[in-house]
Swiss-Prot record:
The gene is nhaG. GO terms for molecular function: potassium:proton antiporter activity; sodium:proton antiporter activity. The lineage of its organism: Bacteria, Bacillati, Bacillota, Bacilli, Bacillales. It comes from Bacillus atrophaeus. InterPro entries: Cation/H_exchanger_CPA1, Cation/H_exchanger_TM. This is Na(+)/H(+) antiporter NhaG. Its main location: membrane.
Length: 524
């Protein structure tokens, strides 16, 4: 790595971005979860010797580079983006399952830890470090699949809420297990007290730092109505809360989540115009897509470093232990939550994918840590199984469980829409053929009248359907309003470009249009 200069590093980084963007674009076009596609392609690139890619592979799979990029560069952005757009009201409405699953993370940690000791014969620190690594979940793939199949919004919120908080808990458990656990065990009862104090201190301090910074930056937004500047505020907030918490010995993950939740809810309420909020969200959408694309490609490349020689049996055992622990954690923690569908429990259980955070944490272990190589093999094996096998089977599972049921009346509406579009196309084609081939009016009008009669009948059926399911009509009206607002925005842009109206008037009118678009999105 010493021979690489900054220019070469930039070239390699840009090359990675191009590859990741290309794979992501293809996956999205094919309506497949892009994280899984990136991991698979990254793994293939890592396994196949391609001279063009060798410097790239060497650069990315260097432990310090991977760890820095994932934890310091991308993790604050990904956590901040997710928490920023999570309405606190939604989190409050679903607090019981989210908190229950937070407790379930501890159940999973204990089961994996003790099972790794007894069944895989790992030393105590190694066993519980591995358990902490397996406590973190990565919901990106699952949430993208949820969106594509129309899964209930509440289920998505629970999955995202669980991930935001158990990632923080996983990092805390990892640090305690890796650096303090043996000391606490040697001290006996006193050590248990110290361990509990460290656990509470790290989480509490993270909450305080994130809360204070989130409040301060929210207050700042009251004094500015300048979305580029407020986007910069959000960048500073996410990274400063993470870095400051880490410097103070607190949980940087929890600090970022709390800061972003406050900024995205309280800050948006007291100091952000709808235009500012929309632009901040759009900026972080782009940042998160870029970060996720690079992260999953890097994970795929990194996974190829593992050496499974003579460890296949233990690797499979590790996967089974983690799956059993996840099942126990989900079903035990959610057992007392009333009116929580069992199909949702199955989905949350199988959708608890492991990802980049687990890989980054295990690579951060000191090279002389006892059992480090074994932990690497087991962690990488579970992550690969999780992203590929669970990731590719979650969609069929949703369909089999019926979690992806569409809105009532939607199927009937789509059938009417398809028939109507078919008939409208037929009418246009008849007119075109009549014009080109000089077919007599009497012949064409008879067929056209027949089609128009059928279209009229479809309109009547659609109106009846709208009366039965008014939410379908509301949805169509929302789509129509949104497109009309986009057209209005472009019309103002054209007037400004032709110097028919001043830039000041154009900006004022466009801001009003954006406000209407934001209100429309918030209402639906």
């Amino acid at each position: 790595m010493e021979h690489l200069d900054l220019h070469h590093i930039f070239e390699l980084g840009f090359f990675v971005v191009m590859i990741a963007a290309g794979i992501t674009a293809i996956a999205k076009k094919c309506r497949q979860p892009y994280p899984i596609a990136l991991v698979i392609v990254g793994t293939i690139i890592g396994l196949v010797h391609i001279p063009l890619f060798e410097p790239l592979k060497e650069f990315i799979t260097e432990g310090e580079v991977f760890n820095f990029v994932i934890i310091t560069l991308f993790l604050p952005a990904l956590l901040g983006e997710a928490a920023l757009k999570l309405p606190f009201s939604h989190l409050r409405e679903n607090k019981r399952p989210v908190l229950a699953l937070f407790g379930g993370t501890l159940i999973s940690f204990l089961i994996v830890g003790f099972s790794s000791m007894w069944l895989m014969h790992l030393a105590i620190p190694a066993a519980f470090v591995f358990a902490a690594l397996m406590s973190a979940t990565d919901p990106v793939s699952v949430l993208s699949i949820f969106k594509s199949v129309g899964a209930p919004k509440k289920l998505s919120i629970v999955v995202e809420g669980e991930s935001l908080f158990n990632d923080g808990l996983a990092v805390v458990l990892f640090n305690i297990s890796a650096f303090y656990l043996m000391t606490y065990l040697d001290l006996g009862i006193q050590g248990a007290g110290l361990g509990l104090w460290e656990f509470v201190k790290v989480i509490s301090l993270g909450l305080i730092i994130g809360g204070v910074l989130g409040y301060v930056f929210s207050q700042l937004t009251k004094y500015f109505d300048d979305y580029p500047l407020e986007i910069i505020f959000s960048i500073i907030l996410f990274y400063s809360s993470f870095l400051l918490a880490e410097m103070a010995g607190a949980s940087g993950v929890i600090a970022v989540v709390v800061a972003a939740l406050i900024f995205g809810n309280y800050g948006a309420k007291i100091g952000m115009s709808p235009t500012t909020k929309l632009n901040i969200n759009n900026f972080w959408d782009v940042a998160a897509l870029l970060a996720n694309s690079l992260v999953f490609l890097m994970v795929g490349l990194e996974i190829t470093r593992i050496d499974l020689t003579d460890k296949w049996g233990l690797a499979i055992m590790a996967i089974v232990i983690v799956l059993i622990a996840r099942s126990a954690a989900v079903y035990i923690s959610l057992a007392f939550i009333k009116k929580f569908p069992v199909t949702w429990k199955h989905t949350i259980n199988w959708g608890g994918l492991k990802g980049s955070l687990s890989i980054a944490l295990v690579l951060s272990l000191p090279r002389d840590f006892p059992g480090r190589e074994d932990i690497l093999v087991f962690a990488f094996s579970v992550v690969l199984f999780s992203l590929v096998v669970q990731g590719l089977t979650i969609k069929p599972l949703l369909e089999r469980l019926g979690v992806n049921q569409k809105e009532e009346g939607n199927q009937e509406y789509e059938e009417l829409l398809a028939k109507g579009h078919r008939l409208e196309t037929a009418i246009k084609e008849v007119q075109q053929v009549k014009h080109n081939l000089l077919i007599h009016e009497a012949v064409s009008s008879e067929l056209t009248d027949q089609y128009k009669k059928e279209v009229s009948q479809l309109h009547q059926q659609t109106n009846k359907l709208f009366e039965t399911y008014p939410e379908l009509k509301n949805k169509q009206q929302t789509i129509l309003k949104k497109h009309s607002l986009y057209a209005q925005y472009q019309a103002i842009e054209n007037l400004s470009r032709e110097d028919i109206i001043s830039n000041e008037v154009a900006e004022l009118e466009q801001a009003r249009i954006i406000d209407e678009i934001v209100r429309l999105q918030n209402d639906h």
